Design a protein with these regions (language model features):
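Accessory carbohydrate-recognition regions in carbohydrate-active enzymes
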Residues: 22-178
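Bacterial Sec-dependent N-terminal signal peptides
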Residues: 1-23
Length: 178
C-alpha cells in the first residue's frame, strides 16, 4: 500500500507542478484583420451562430446620388481598427467577405440629448456616435467589451447561437437611454 501511495503522491505532485496550459481560445486574437482590407469584425459570435454582435465604427453608403463611394469597401465588416469612434453595435456581420452587407439591428447606448444622425468620424459631436480608446477594448472569442468615452458607458457583448446579448453599465448619475 505504501508503494501505491508514494506513486500516487509523485504523480499528483508532478501534475500540480506542471505549468497551466492555455485554453486554445486564449490564443485567438479577434482584432487581427480588422484594419485595412482584412474585413473582419472584433465582436462576439458562437460557432455556427446566426448573430455576430459587434461594434460598427462607421456606416458609409455604397452610393450617394448614384455615385459609388469607394470608402464603403473599407467597412465590409463594419469595423476599422484605425477608427476612434463607434456608431453603434449591430447583430449581423460577415467576416472576410470583401462585400459590405448586414450591420442590421444597430443599438447605441447614450446619456443626454437624443440625436438622430450618427455624425461623422471627423466630428463625432455632430451625431450620436461616441469616441472610444483601444486601451479599454477587450476582444476574445465570444466576448467583446469597450468603454464609450463620451458618455462613460461600459459596453459588454456576447452571443449564443441565436441571440446577441448586450450589457450596458451607465454612470449612476446619468439618464440611461438606448
Amino acid at each position: 500500500h505504501m508503494q501505491k501511495l508514494m506513486k500516487s503522491l509523485i504523480v499528483a505532485f508532478a501534475y500540480m507542478s506542471m505549468p497551466i496550459m492555455a485554453q486554445k481560445t486564449d490564443l485567438v486574437n479577434p482584432i487581427i484583420g480588422t484594419n485595412g482590407m482584412g474585413h473582419t469584425f472584433p465582436g462576439a459570435c458562437a460557432p455556427f451562430g446566426i448573430v455576430q454582435v459587434s461594434p460598427d465604427t462607421d456606416t458609409i453608403p455604397h452610393n450617394i446620388d448614384g455615385v459609388y463611394q469607394p470608402r464603403a469597401y473599407e467597412y465590409c465588416a463594419g469595423y476599422q481598427h484605425k477608427d476612434s469612434s463607434i456608431v453603434g453595435f449591430s447583430h449581423t456581420h460577415f467576416s472576410g467577405t470583401g462585400h459590405s452587407d448586414l450591420g442590421d439591428i444597430l443599438l447605441m447606448p447614450f446619456t443626454g440629448k437624443l440625436q438622430i444622425n450618427p455624425g461623422t468620424a471627423d466630428n463625432p459631436d455632430s451625431g450620436y456616435r461616441s469616441r472610444f480608446s483601444h486601451d479599454t477594448e477587450i476582444s476574445r472569442p465570444g466576448y467583446y467589451e469597450v468603454l464609450l468615452t463620451d458618455d462613460q458607458i461600459k459596453v459588454q457583448l456576447t452571443a449564443t447561437e441565436r441571440t446577441g446579448i448586450h450589457k450596458y453599465t451607465y454612470p449612476a448619475d446619468q439618464k440611461k437611454q438606448l
